[in-house]
Amino acid sequence: MDALYSHFSQVLEQQRKANTRLVVAFSGGVDSRVLLELAHRYAQEHLLPCCAVHVHHGLSHNADQWVQSCAAWCQEKNIPLTVERVQLDLTQGNSIEEEARNARYQALRAHINADDLLLTGQHADDQVETFLLALKRGSGPKGLSSMAQQMPFSQGRLIRPLLDVRRQEIERCAHAIGLHWVEDESNQDTRYDRNFLRQQILPALSERWPSFAASVQRSATLCAEQEALLDELLLPVFEQLFGEDQSLAITLLSQQSELARFKLLRMWLAKLGHPMPTRHQLSLIWQQVALSQADANPILQLSQGQVRRFNQRLYLVADNQDLSAWHAPITLNTPLALPDGLGTIELTVSRGFGQIALPEQSEALWISFNPEGLSAHPAERGHSRKLKKLFQEYQVPSWLRRRTPILMYHQQVVAVAGLFVDRQFIGQDCELFWRK
């Protein structure tokens, strides 16, 4: 255990700060069980706070018992434990493994503050499995880099201190100090790809080539280094392409070679937190979205959003609710919560300083998101026009036109938030504030 602790300490020394807090991702399995022991010892020696987070997926009938076991083990060490219960969304077409992993990291993300270190228990055998799964998918250097030992995560960093340690060494240490841990029965189910590799493939590879795991780790490191070098070389180009609104300039992108263009698209999606696209998806982004006809409104659906085009720039747009049917009355000086994360809107009385004249029946004011069939006459325009045309003139992207609040009086447009006030309602009684 001392040798393992020495290795653990060396990894953490590179990342520890004066106000660092250790957060252990604690499933209760043997890897995280040993990790908890190491983190507790390190925290005591360096006078650091240490806590644990257990994610309850609800996939096993033993899950509640695992929570009790984890709570007992943390209590023995006086380590605070938080239990996060998650619901898996299996409608997206992802495997149960992938959805569980995504839900787990999303739950952990909420617990990581500035300078925190999230410690996870992946080891060298996990790295081999990840590498082989990436190879099966036909991944390039990015995917074959597998898992990084440390990386930014939420407001802190994610550290995998055991990534260079074989599973058998972790189990040997656990037995040596008399630890108990939970066993996930699904780990024996070879219908899952990772379990198939673990149970049937890796033992044969390791028996034939004992240094196979170390060789895979070396290859993964080389792939990561090549990918990092490519990022470094293309960063000046990427910074020219990338806009303040997180869009990408199509004209400048078209001046790059196809290889550079695809890499820059990957860098863009990675910066926005989107999973790595396939080569086919990259080709579709370029051919069907970037190069579509000037009057087209192209859309390419990805796993976590849509790629859209506007004013010769590419945008990654989140999948949003259809708000066409949403409407609500608005009361003076009372913030109105808007749906789908669009913030609040408030009509504030400010006599003599406002932009809108109050109609006689202010109780007939309401908010809508549906511009269909509506017209308005902005004060600075010569005549009335359909809202569809006005949105185009005011350079509002098509996907935001049904997400921009419209202030209505009966069936008349009073104002469009952030754009204009209809000339019929120009005055100084009140102002419309949209806080996104």
From Swiss-Prot:
An individual GO BP term: tRNA modification
Main localization of the protein described in the UniProt heading: cytoplasm
**Where does the UniProt annotation locate this protein?**
Cytoplasm
Residues that hold ATP according to the record: S27, G28, G29, V30, D31, S32
A GO CC term? cytoplasm
Tell me the keywords, alphabetical order.
ATP-binding, Cytoplasm, Ligase, Nucleotide-binding, tRNA processing
Q: What is its EC number?
A: 6.3.4.19
Recorded GO molecular functions are: ATP binding; tRNA(Ile)-lysidine synthase activity
Reactions performed catalytically = cytidine(34) in tRNA(Ile2) + L-lysine + ATP = lysidine(34) in tRNA(Ile2) + AMP + diphosphate + H(+)
Matches recorded under Gene3D superfamilies: 1.20.59.20, HUPs (3.40.50.620)
| Xref: NCBIfam families | lysidine_TilS_C, lysidine_TilS_N
Its function?
Answer: Ligates lysine onto the cytidine present at position 34 of the AUA codon-specific tRNA(Ile) that contains the anticodon CAU, in an ATP-dependent manner. Cytidine is converted to lysidine, thus changing the amino acid specificity of the tRNA from methionine to isoleucine.
Q: Which HAMAP family match?
A: tRNA_Ile_lys_synt (MF_01161)
**Assigned protein family:** Belongs to the tRNA(Ile)-lysidine synthase family.
Domain topic, free-text comment:
The N-terminal region contains the highly conserved SGGXDS motif, predicted to be a P-loop motif involved in ATP binding.
Identify this protein by name.
tRNA(Ile)-lysidine synthase
Q: Which gene encodes it?
A: tilS
